[in-house]
Regions:
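Active-site neighborhoods and metal-handling regions in enzymes and metal-associated proteins
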Residues: 1-86
Length: 86
């Protein structure tokens, strides 16, 4: 099924995608040895909420965080923690 979007809906999608790109660029810069995935998550949530948006993952089926962070041996959907990146 193809969903047709209005111009207003497309504009909202464009704006939120720009926000996501900006946040991901900032998080990419943060990802360095010694930084915890919880710190990355905190910054992501702060940036999203400051922009007037809501984190999509947080609370979805009980997911406790804003981002999914997988590092090293983790495969996917890692829950942010106080574990430092190495």
């Amino acid at each position: 099924m193809i969903v047709c979007r209005s111009h207003a809906e497309i504009e909202k999608l464009r704006r939120v995608n720009q926000l996501v790109a900006q946040v991901l660029a900032e998080l990419r810069q943060m990802a360095a040895p010694g930084v915890t995935t919880a710190e990355i998550d905190h910054v992501a949530e702060e940036r999203v909420r400051t922009a007037g948006a809501e984190p999509a993952f947080k609370g979805y089926h009980g997911y406790p965080a804003t981002v999914c962070v997988s590092a090293n041996e983790q495969v996917v959907h890692g829950i942010p923690s106080n574990r430092q990146l190495v």
